[in-house]
Each structure stands twice: as C-alpha cells, then as structure tokens.
C-alpha cells in the first residue's frame, strides 16, 4: 500500500501542485558558484533547492582508446556521501552513484559538450584525459540534475594545465591560457508524469 506522503504527492499532482508549494512546471531555485577549488582545473558548487553538490575537473595525459585514436577521454565519477544523507554508506560508490555518474557522463558525451578531437596531442599515442569528480553535500532530491549542472559549470571554468612535450610531463603548478574546448552548453532537466500531470523535479 502507498504511504501517506506518496498518496498526498499524487493527490496534489492531479491539481498541478506539490508538497513544497511549487507549481508543476516550477523549478527549484538554482545557485551556482565556480572556482571553489584552487587545485582543480575547474570547479563548481551547485545548489538545486536544498540539494548541494560540488564538482571538480582534473586532467592528465594518457593513451587514446583504440577506437578513437584522435580523441581525448572523459571519465565521470560521483560519490553520494553519508554527509549528504543517512541513506548512503561509507565505502565504494553504490549502484545509485554509479548510475548517476553514467547518466552525467552520457549527457556530457552525447551532447558533444567537449570537443574531444581538440584534446588530441599526438594521434594514436597521447591525448588529454578529462576527469570530472562529483560529490554530494546534501541530498534533498534531484541529485542528478544538480550533478549535471555542476559538471557543466566546472568544465566551463576549466583551464588546461601546461604540458611539456619534450619532457612528456604535465606541469600542474602552472596553468595555460587554454580553456577546455567546449561547444554549446547542454541543460539537463528531469521530469515525471504523475497521472496526466507533467512535473519538473
């Protein structure tokens, strides 16, 4: 049987309303702060309503994948920390965190946000790896959209570290004036259909 809060949510949804007072298509308040980490190539803190996440971008040089010898690599990871909710445990990322990271990875990758061809240093040998690490600080719902927004904001402010081709070494103490090559910025929106009502999360 449905619990009382679920029944109330469904009842309000049929009227285009919800428990927190927002209308069906009304977003949570979104706040974005960038440049929160001195050690990351780019970083952001995002609040979507009471949900808060932080994201950082780090880069290093590695080998390309065999099926894309002239393109850089993207790796997204996410941790749902016990700090953010009692539902989460210490230890390796759980299924929920892995799934959210996979969805953010797909959103960034399939939207063509990063021009990965411009991350190639030497075809078939060396490319830039772009790591996006995301951590939940408070989970009050819709961590997925908050994580996606934080990832995009961190990428948008990221500058590439310098790479010494002779020494084949990245100099993390000095930033170049090159930003991570980006295309048009994607926007991730989660919505649900409850009865006949479409609701923004």
Named regions from a protein language model:
Residues 1-201:
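Polyanion-binding surfaces on beta-sheet-dominated domains and ring/shell assemblies
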């Amino acid at each position: 049987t449905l619990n009382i809060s679920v029944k109330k949510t469904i009842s309000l949804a049929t009227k285009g309303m919800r428990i927190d007072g927002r209308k069906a298509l009304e977003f949570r308040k979104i706040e974005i702060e960038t440049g929160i980490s001195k050690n990351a190539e780019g970083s952001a803190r995002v609040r979507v309503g009471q949900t808060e996440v932080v994201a950082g971008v780090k880069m290093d040089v590695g080998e390309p994948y065999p099926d894309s010898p002239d393109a850089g690599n993207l790796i997204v990871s996410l941790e749902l920390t016990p700090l953010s909710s009692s539902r989460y445990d210490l230890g390796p990322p759980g299924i929920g965190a892995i799934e959210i990271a996979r969805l953010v990875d797909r959103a960034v990758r399939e939207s063509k946000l990063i021009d990965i061809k411009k991350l190639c240093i030497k075809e078939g040998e060396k490319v830039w790896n772009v790591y996006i690490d995301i951590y939940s600080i408070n989970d009050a719902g819709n961590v997925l959209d908050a994580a996606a927004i934080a990832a995009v904001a961190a990428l948008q402010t990221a500058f590439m570290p310098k790479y010494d081709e002779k020494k084949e070494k990245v100099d993390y103490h000095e930033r170049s004036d090159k930003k991570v090559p980006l295309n048009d910025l994607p926007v991730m929106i989660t919505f649900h259909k409850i009865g006949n009502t479409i609701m923004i999360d």
